[in-house]
Amino acid sequence: MKILIVDDFSTMRRIIKNLLRDLGFTNTAEADDGTTALPMLHSGNFDFLVTDWNMPGMTGIDLLRAVRADERLKHLPVLMVTAEAKRDQIIEAAQAGVNGYVVKPFTAQVLKEKIEKIFERVNG
């Protein structure tokens, strides 16, 4: 399984990457915003996307919308990991087609549970 981690904050990318590795997901790549991530998604055969919301260039919500609008990418599972905890933003992400939503700060257990739930829904 190949996972793309998108966040403009390199420390957060590293935290997510390390947590994913601890969960057994070792094949990861990183991008610092949606503008960088979208071409990587087109050429990289990714199986899963973890993205922040607030980033310069293309935001995570715009990246999510671009993924859902793309015939080749629209089935890609997307987990949003963000500080955006307002109800309106969670609803906006759900309406845009996000598969899971984690509010920062979070624990490894929360990340694990969200990823497992996404796979249950995608595979079930």
Curated annotation (Swiss-Prot):
Report the protein name in the record.
Answer: Chemotaxis protein CheY
The coding gene here is cheY
Which residues of the sequence carry a binding annotation for Mg(2+)?
D7, D8, D52, N54
Top-level taxonomic group: Bacteria
Per the record, the GO terms for biological process are:
archaeal or bacterial-type flagellum-dependent cell motility; chemotaxis; phosphorelay signal transduction system; positive regulation of single-species biofilm formation
Which metal ions or organic cofactors does this protein require, according to UniProt? Mg(2+)
Q: How is the cofactor bound?
A: Binds 1 Mg(2+) ion per subunit.
SUPFAM superfamilies this protein is in? CheY-like (SSF52172)
Residues modified as 4-aspartylphosphate are D52
Mind telling me which CDD domains this protein's record contains?
REC_CheY_CheY3
**Where is it located?**
Cytoplasm
